[in-house]
Amino acid sequence: MRQKGWGRIINFSSSAGKNISTVGGAHYTAAKAGILGFTRHLASEEAKYGITVNAVCPGLINTEMVKNTINDDDIKKYANSFPIKRLGKASEVASLVLFLSSDEAEYITGASLDINGGDLMI
């Protein structure tokens, strides 16, 4: 990436990295917060090489992991507490990653982008 003068690094954190985890413990929250610090630091080092570094912070996304970790009643409770009233879709996270990977995102670096149905607003 440095040789080409262009690159995109996209790290995955979580809403838990900015708040607390609804299903993970303190270790999960600490790890996800660490990814955010790493992202900012690496972004400051790599920007001069044309490399952007960002983090995607999903909330509850409708995945097998969520279905296997949280019971259906709690999933409904969480979804209804979000302003958008549903869990996110993996395709929505993929669309954000695709954008961050593109030339159109060349001025975005060191950012942590929430994709959580408005959960962190409340």
Would you name each region that the model predicts?
Residues 14:
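Residue(s) in the substrate-gating loop at a strand-loop-helix junction
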Residues 68-82:
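A short C-terminal helix-loop "cap" of Rossmann-like NAD(P)-dependent dehydrogenase/epimerase domains
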Residues 44-45, 106:
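Alpha-helical segment proximal to the catalytic Tyr-Lys
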Residues 31, 39:
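Active-site helix of classical SDR
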Residues 19, 98, 109-122:
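Short C-terminal tail/terminal secondary-structure segment
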Residues 57-68:
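Short, flexible catalytic-loop segment of classical short-chain dehydrogenase/reductase
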Residues 19-26, 48-49, 85, 103:
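Active-site loop immediately N-terminal to the catalytic Tyr-X3-Lys motif
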Residues 82-93, 104:
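A conserved structural motif in NAD(P)-dependent oxidoreductases
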